[in-house]
């Protein structure tokens, strides 16, 4: 596993309801492409097991962001409901890909992200190791 292979594989998972998938954070978004998914903020941990510098377990973290809708579009209740639906869809996609991607755990949250405008966004922090 490498940073690149994990981020690329995670970016390629299919999440029900996502219209557009990016391989990197987009510089701008079109409402016609929403919900849109992209990776962000990869992290890595490499521990040394002994004094001979044997590498330990390779662990990587990447956040997947799913941009739902601009804040000024729709009502808060409708946008919140869309976020809940997308949380379920993303959770199902991560469950389906746990073995293939060596996923250890994930956590998800709703947040606001700015791409010119502010958007309702779901962010999953996905951890994997091998």
Predicted regions and their residues:
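Charged, amphipathic alpha-helical segments and their flanking helix caps
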Residues: 1-31, 42-130
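A short glycine-rich, His/Asp/Glu-containing loop-to-beta-strand
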Residues: 35-39
